[in-house]
A protein has these predicted regions:
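Conserved beta-strand->loop/alpha-helix structural units within folded catalytic cores of enzymes
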Residues: 76, 80, 87-89, 246-248
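Conserved beta-strand elements of the Class I
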Residues: 83-85, 186
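Conserved residues at the C-terminal ends of beta-strands
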Residues: 15, 88, 112
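Active-site segment of extracytoplasmic enzymes that catalyze sulfate/phosphate-ester chemistry
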Residues: 1-72, 76-82, 96, 104-108, ...
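Active-site-proximal cap/lid insertion segments
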Residues: 1, 10, 40-42, 90-92, ...
Length: 289
């Protein structure tokens, strides 16, 4: 419906093949050859481990920070009177760096600081920040139900706090607070259907299991944090439909609040196809657009 009622950009491509530099293009307005962010460099590799239950994670996560000398899109908008929210993946700096959402023009944030962490849908923690609440910095929100069970292997399926749904709920709560006459911009940087192929065992997934009744399996990789799955095509298709439902929720909320005629909605992506986590871009015909 969004495509039918709007304008389609059929020759538009993401700014880079991978997420952090692609997002840097959007945030800085620079070509990928000019922005400082050239890849998905991970800062957790140098950080000390931290325990969440029996699970080991990293004490600092994130990517190369945007330069504080270069003003970025949320800062421009906030400086011009917009309320700003970002819900999903940041990938524009690491925890404690000069470039976290609280320091770069974002009023409300909930999601992942790190693009690598954002590959996992039942994580140990998410990050949050609220200027309205008086928060001083981005902090971690431990997902207490998830950390009762292992990140990988037997028992993982008992984790119940699905990050994509949690992030969408926060985004909708924020959107519901916005009012006509007060400009706002929301960066809803959802991660579906990227990387890990997993979601709640609900009617949406079960429906696709019936469609892809002879499905492709993926057995995982040694040392990988991605769990094996026996329904790669059904998982991927259902994750796309789940994202589609999120978009529908946003459009209905804008209409409900009388904001749809004065709100510009842009749907785009930050990276091209990949085979990570068992994804099958050949089957689904993705070409990076």
């Amino acid at each position: 419906k969004l495509a039918q009622e709007g304008m389609r950009f059929t020759q538009a491509y993401a700014g880079s093949p991978v997420s952090a530099p692609s997002r840097a293009c959007l945030m800085t307005g620079q070509h990928s050859g000019h922005t400082e962010v050239r890849g998905n460099k991970e800062y957790w590799t140098d950080s000390a481990p931290v325990k969440y239950g029996d699970n080991t994670d990293f004490s600092v996560v994130g990517q190369h920070p945007y330069s504080p000398d270069h003003i970025i899109l949320p800062e421009v908008l906030r400086n011009n009177g917009y309320t700003t929210g970002l819900f999903g993946k940041w990938a524009g700096g690491y925890e404690g760096s000069v470039s976290t959402p609280d320091k770069r023009g974002i009023d409300e944030f909930y999601g992942y600081i790190c693009q690598f962490q954002a590959h996992l849908y039942y994580p140990n923690f998410l990050n949050e920040y609220s200027r309205k609440r008086g928060d001083k910095a981005v902090s971690r929100v431990v997902l207490e139900e998830n950390i009762k069970y292992p990140m990988t292997g037997k028992g993982y399926e008992k984790r119940t706090q699905y990050s994509a749904d949690l992030i969408h709920q926060k985004a909708m709560q924020w959107l519901d607070q916005q009012q006509a006459g007060k400009p706002f911009v929301g960066f809803l940087t959802y991660t579906l259907p990227h990387a890990e192929l997993v979601q709640p065992e609900d009617s949406l997934l079960e429906g696709y299991k019936k469609i892809f009744f002879v499905d492709k399996t993926w057995g995982g990789q040694p040392g990988s944090r991605y769990n094996a799955t026996v329904h790669t095509h059904a998982q991927f298709a259902a994750m796309i439909s789940r994202l589609d439902q999120y978009v529908g929720d946003v459009m209905r909320k804008l209409k409900e609040k009388g904001l749809e005629e004065n709100t510009l909605v842009i749907f785009t992506s930050d990276n091209g196809p990949h085979e990570e986590g068992g994804a099958d871009p050949t089957f689904f015909g993705r070409d990076g657009k």
